[in-house]
């Protein structure tokens, strides 16, 4: 038989696995006959999936001042968005007030600036928080922004037990990938558990943490590493909650996840399926979860920002559409589709609408949501799912051998693995082994940018600085300092900080002021290794 001629020397997934030229029946077919909605939920957590309820269309948005972002939220809701997702700016993410010297030039640039309860009120003015679920992407100072949100609900007479939404609040991935930590790993994990504990007792409909693989993938990991490191972080939080004395079925059903949808279409679908299966089996076998809801992994997906290109930016609409489809075929519970201009600026109003319309076309025109897990039983998809599960389990074992997650962070294990994978990927692009249209092939040498770019006015910095100065003059400073002292004492006594932070928020305490009080007890952290 003559040798087949193929267009490349080898075919690999983005994770680096060699791909066969075709896939046929497997010895593991017993796993493939399980229906959607049945343990271990490989095929989806609901029997009828999107036939019953479509995924939540939750576009990540925030820029400039709370007033400007509030206008954008109302625009998105008017155009059919079904949930809100807050993007904070760098000063807020790092725990600085807008008038801090390190905030200069950064206020409102990559998200909305929120420094106080007053800002939170403006951000959600005219939005019914009992009806709209709100996701907040905040980590280092997550417990502070959470306290602002709860204080706002109470001020508006809302029963907090009715609040729906998600707080990202995933400290561990900050040290691995996002690099926006404030405190050392151990106290940061303690703060995560504080919020989980508070929500389990007071806010049963709220997801207190969104364990995030998205940033791990954006930093350069493979799909297998994203899967493994993310689930491993989830297990680490479970261990801390159990040590606190919480019962597994009192909180596990509110743990949520956040994954990336990259360009390797079938590998991404398999990744989501493997995540559900691993989670269900581990929660049942290791942690003894009995509540069916605890076994069902729920996740949000965002299309891959790192796959977008500044060159020929209109092509990003197509990339995003394929990535969104992989997320839906993989059973995501909510979805953000990136805008075509995000390599160049925060999304313009037009670009944000196109991104939302991409989801709506997928939901209402393609027929994709009409059948649960339509790719289930595909020999290719099932073998990919099995392979990713095996990769993940191998990583779990390595991390355990190193002494657990925090020790592996301090030793630089995750950071080095991600850096190695990022380097391999970039080499494949540089060598043209992997083609990126418009970047290393099909290039337009004389390309001119002709899309609208959103520009953030310097007025955002001035406005936020003026607001915080006015706040400091108008608040009851004596009462605030009394509440700050109680907060400091609670830090030292290892108490749950949420009630103390709500009191500080109500008295006009700012993000930066609160962080400084907490730093004096918890300290700060610096990486002590090189990559």
Each predicted region: which residue ranges?
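Conserved active-site and cofactor/substrate-binding residues in soluble primary-metabolism enzymes
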Residues: 36, 64-71, 114-118, 140-147, ...
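Active-site capping/gating regions of soluble enzymes
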Residues: 212, 228-237, 253-438
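Catalytic or ion-translocation cores adjacent to nucleophile or general acid/base/metal-coordination motifs
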Residues: 160-162, 191, 346, 528-531
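Short, structured secondary-structure boundary patches
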Residues: 105-108, 182-186, 355-357, 428-431, ...
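Short Asp/Glu-rich motifs
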Residues: 95-96, 172, 345-347, 418, ...
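Catalytic alpha/beta active-site cores
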Residues: 1-262, 267, 286, 293-300, ...
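Generic secondary-structure signature for well-ordered alpha-helical cores
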Residues: 82, 125-129, 151-159, 193-205, ...
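Flexible, glycine-rich loop/tail regions that form catalytic "lids" or insertion modules at the edges
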Residues: 2-28, 35, 39-42, 90, ...
């Amino acid at each position: 038989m003559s040798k087949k001629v193929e267009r490349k020397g080898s075919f690999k997934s983005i994770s680096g696995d060699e791909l066969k030229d075709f896939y046929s029946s497997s010895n593991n077919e017993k796993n493939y006959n399980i229906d959607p909605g049945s343990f271990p939920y490989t095929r989806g957590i609901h029997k009828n999936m999107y036939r019953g309820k479509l995924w939540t269309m939750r576009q990540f948005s925030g820029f400039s001042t709370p007033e400007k972002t509030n206008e954008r939220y109302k625009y998105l809701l008017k155009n059919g968005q079904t949930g809100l997702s807050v993007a904070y700016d760098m000063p807020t993410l790092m725990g600085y007030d807008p008038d801090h010297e390190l905030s200069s030039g950064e206020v409102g640039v990559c998200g909305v600036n929120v420094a106080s309860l007053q800002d939170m009120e403006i951000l959600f003015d005219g939005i019914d928080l009992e009806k709209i679920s709100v996701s907040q992407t905040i980590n280092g100072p997550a417990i502070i922004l959470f306290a602002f949100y709860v204080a706002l609900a109470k001020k508006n007479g809302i029963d907090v037990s009715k609040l729906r939404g998600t707080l990202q609040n995933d400290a561990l991935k900050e040290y691995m990938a996002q690099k926006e930590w404030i405190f050392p790993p151990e106290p940061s994990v303690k703060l995560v558990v504080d919020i989980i504990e508070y929500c389990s007792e007071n806010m049963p409909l709220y997801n207190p943490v969104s364990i995030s693989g998205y940033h791990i993938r954006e930093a350069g990991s493979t799909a297998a590493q994203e899967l493994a490191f993310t689930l491993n972080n989830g297990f680490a939080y479970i261990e801390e909650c159990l040590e606190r004395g919480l019962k597994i079925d009192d909180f596990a059903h509110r743990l949520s996840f956040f994954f990336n949808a990259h360009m390797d279409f079938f590998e991404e679908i398999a990744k989501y399926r493997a995540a559900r299966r691993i989670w269900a089996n581990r929660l049942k076998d290791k942690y003894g979860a009995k509540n069916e809801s605890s076994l069902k992994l729920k996740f949000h997906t965002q299309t891959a920002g790192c796959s977008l290109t500044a060159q020929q930016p209109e092509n990003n609409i197509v990339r995003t559409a394929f990535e969104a489809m992989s997320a839906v075929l993989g059973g995501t519970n909510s979805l953000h589709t990136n805008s075509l201009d995000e390599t160049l600026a925060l999304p313009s109003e037009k670009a944000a609408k196109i991104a939302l319309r991409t989801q709506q076309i997928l939901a209402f025109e393609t027929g994709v949501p009409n059948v649960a897990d339509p790719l289930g039983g595909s020999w290719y998809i099932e073998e990919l799912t099995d392979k990713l599960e095996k990769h993940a389990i191998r990583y779990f074992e390595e991390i355990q051998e190193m002494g657990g997650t925090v020790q592996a962070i301090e030793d630089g294990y995750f950071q080095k693995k991600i850096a190695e994978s990022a380097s391999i990927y970039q080499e494949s692009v540089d060598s043209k082994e992997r083609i990126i249209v418009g970047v290393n092939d099909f290039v337009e040498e004389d390309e001119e940018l002709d899309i609208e770019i959103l520009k953030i006015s310097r007025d955002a910095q001035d406005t936020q600085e003026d607001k915080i100065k006015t706040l400091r003059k108008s608040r009851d400073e004596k009462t605030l300092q009394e509440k700050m002292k109680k907060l400091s004492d609670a830090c030292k006594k290892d108490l749950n900080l949420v009630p103390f932070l709500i009191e500080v928020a109500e008295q006009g305490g700012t993000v930066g002021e609160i962080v400084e009080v907490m730093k004096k007890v918890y300290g700060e952290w610096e990486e002590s290794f090189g990559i």
